[in-house]
């Protein structure tokens, strides 16, 4: 009897354990199923959120966004100059700009100890000289090339290099309004004590040394700029980020003491964070290099190598355009896109009747060997509606985000609009602007 009872006890125990195990498995499956449903639901919500913002939208949407309720409600963000327009050119190029960097490469701080700019990759310097020769937009002979993490770091390096180190007062930094909105913030960011923002160059009247930032073509209005102050004791920094054939006629090679360039707006590779300066004075170049050394101990070699490859492909496309490998040059493609975008914008502005845009006189472009107009990377739009004083707020009410004139040192009737976003975003902007009526 005892043996039987013990056997029955084991059987009952085993049955209970099996029952508990099956219940646990069943609950786990329900939880897993619920989790999958939650993930799928979350993914759909995330996708909706993702598509709601133009700066993050997918360029490969199955249908035009303007045909969906989501597209109609979408906020068009053209406040910044993110050059995603250029994806149209680079995606079909395949592996032409692909590079492979082995794990052992680019490990040292030093790139070329024989070069004044010791952290600059020789191949990048070579391609900079080549692209300027191909385009004809800058003199490189007799210049020292300084590489920086975008032209923003190079501007700060230039201000550091050009400011008197032993003066009791900071040197004034000016630029003609409308000026690039980041100039005041960058100049006064660290309150260095050696330079300070002094505003509009057109009204600067102090009898003292100054640094004038000359942006040409200008950001935001697109006009070719020349120095405004023209007094003794002045030092010039030329920001030529937009002096490329897709934006403006290349009339002559820039021959300045200090010029700044960047791959961001020349080729569209803003994410590389690579720019360069062409500097005539060796001592100024040395001080700029010292600033970058103290600031970031040089510049990413990987970015330089990739930028060198991109510039090489651009130059190849210009020299071999019309062949089997390059049907058209990068700048021909970019110029065509910009021409069409400005045509659409001017038509939309005309239909609306509430806005106006600058007019640019044609000029001979040596690169294209033709008389061409200017088609800037940004549109400088003015709201002519009488009862609208703040154009930025007015357009925001129509789900169009721009940057208002107050950031550029002028009135709030003006806004800056990026012309460089993806095609879907730009077309939605044109459609929406055309529908605004008085």
Model-predicted regions and their roles:
Residues 2-438:
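PLP-dependent class I/II
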